[in-house]
Every structure is written in C-alpha cells, then in structure tokens.
Amino acid sequence: MEFCHTETLQVVRLSQNATIPARGSPGAAGLDLCSAYDCVIPSHCSRVVFTDLLIKPPSGCYGRIAPRSGLAVKHFIDVGAGVIDEDYRGNVGVVLFNFGNSDFEVKKGDRIAQLICERISCPAVQEVNCLDNTDRGDSGFGSTGSGACGGRDTAWYIS
C-alpha cells in the first residue's frame, strides 16, 4: 500500500529528549507521540506528559491526540482531551489517565499517544429562535442504538 503525502506536519524539537512523530506502519492514520521524560502516573491519577515538541498541523487541519490501544488494553492507560489547534505553538503535552490499580511508569522515548491530523470546519455562529424538526428530535444517550444487537442491549467487557 502506497500513500501520497502532499501536506507537511511541521515539528520543532525543544530538547534532545524529543522524538519526531512517526507512523507505526505505512497505512497508520496516527503518528506516534513519545514521552520526553521519565515519570510515574500513580494508580487512579492523571498526569500531563510532555513531548518537548512544537507541532504545526497542515493548513485547514488540527491535531487530535488519541489513545494507543495497547496501552489501554494492557495497562488501563487512556488519553484525555487533546487538541492541537492550527495556531498553537506550545510544548505538546499528553494527558494520561491511569485507571489501573498499579502505578504506571513512563520512560523517556515511550510511545504514549498518537497524533491524527483531521480536517476542520470553522463555521460562523448564528443565534436563531428555533431549529428545524427531525424524526429523532431530542432523543439522545443511546436512543438510536436500542435493540441493535439482536433485540437486546449488549456491552462487551475486557477482564
């Protein structure tokens, strides 16, 4: 599989600890982000882990910081809200949550998250008196998924 990279993600290393983001495979949507420092995330706590990178997404895009599935499944580590706006120029930090019962050790150079560049729309905001009606209306929080799994609600758990 061959991909054409016509856009550029600009990156500046703030220290020698920084690792340039890279894809784990040629077809990967995300670029791996690595920790620039050793740290410990205590059980049931969160920490901001810095990459020592400045990142400028391509024009018309933002960078979404997303979890790495292996960290979630094996160590109960998840990534908090992470958006790199097109005009942000600070050190990229990754919010890591440790939902496990043991402290989690992060080493310098560990892959802690992935960066996905996504196109954005920046619409103007218009206040109106009402919105048009739809069949769905104000039904939310699972209303469209009821009975989707053979007539019963199903949840999958990994133990």
Curated annotation (Swiss-Prot):
Major enzyme class: hydrolase
Q: Does the keyword Magnesium apply?
A: yes
According to its UniProt record, which reaction does this protein catalyse? dUTP + H2O = dUMP + diphosphate + H(+)
UniProt keywords, alphabetically: Hydrolase, Magnesium, Metal-binding, Nucleotide metabolism
The EC number on file is: 3.6.1.23
Which CDD domains does this entry report, sorted A to Z? Answer: trimeric_dUTPase (cd07557)
The record's listing under NCBIfam families reads: dut (TIGR00576), PRK00601.1 (NF001862)
Q: What is this protein called?
A: Deoxyuridine 5'-triphosphate nucleotidohydrolase
| Organism of provenance | Orf virus (strain NZ2)
